[in-house]
Design a protein with these regions (language model features):
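Conserved "HGTGT" condensation-loop signature of ketosynthase/thiolase-family condensing enzymes
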Residues: 1-135, 139-146, 151-228
Length: 228
């Protein structure tokens, strides 16, 4: 079957607060955005940008939409920050940080805003960027569990972790292009295997971003830099 990439976003960790849309639509849709931990802020920013490009709006009739998120460290940085607030006694523990000590909070926030009711879950991924999320998203579509899936990669590295890429990358895959010109067409075969219509195999989110050829979506934007 043919599926379509209808939205994509790359949000490097160092740039999340500089994006102008954070003060516009995203501020209106996520009134608590300023209280989110950084992990949730970056994830919501990327999902919102990709979903908006794909034509999704809060209240849109398409509800059978899911999100699969993968990453290696999850919300570990927030978990450590919360634990630090407990050291002087449990009565001083931060209730705000506690609210974000699970990596699935971010996708729950996004699904709630758009009214999505499809498969929504988090995977531990240590392979290529977003390969686990992309494979599961494709499989959910192939099995008929959803009409559209967002495959997402989100990574914030704790200070003790090896240096590497940080930020979020999100791809929107749909079975119907809704009369619009998609960013990319892909072939989805049995077993959830994805390939470009030219036959080139797609395994990671980076493969899709590279195929789109948009400098603003280049995977290299997520790589670590010496300066913010």
């Amino acid at each position: 079957m043919i599926v379509y990439v209808t939205g994509a976003a790359v949000v490097p960790r160092r740039r999340v607060r500089s994006f102008p849309y954070l003060e516009g639509e995203i501020a209106a849709r996520f009134p608590r955005f300023g209280r989110f931990d950084e992990y949730t802020q970056i994830g919501c920013a990327a999902v919102f940008k990709a979903a908006w490009q794909a034509g999704f709006r809060p209240g849109s009739p398409l509800r059978n939409v899911g999100i699969v998120l993968s990453g290696q460290y999850g919300s570990f940085e927030t978990d450590e920050a919360f634990y630090a607030t407990t050291l002087a006694g449990p009565e001083l523990a931060s209730p705000n940080l506690f609210s974000y000590t699970l990596p699935n909070i971010v996708i729950g926030e996004c699904a709630l805003q758009f009214g999505w009711m499809g498969p929504t879950y988090v995977l531990d991924g240590e392979g290529g960027r977003g390969d686990a999320a992309l494979a599961e998203a494709a499989a959910d579509i192939e099995r008929g569990r959803s009409e559209a899936m967002l495959a997402a990669w989100l990574e914030l590295r704790p200070e003790w972790a090896p240096r590497g890429a940080e930020g979020a990358a999100v791809i929107v895959i749909e079975t119907d292009r809704k009369g619009r010109r998609p960013l990319l067409e892909m072939d989805l075969s049995r077993g959830g295997r994805l390939a470009l219509t030219s036959g080139e195999r797609i395994v990671t989110i980076d493969d899709i971003l590279s195929a789109l050829g948009d400098p603003g979506l280049a995977p290299g934007l997520l790589e670590a830099r010496d300066t913010p």
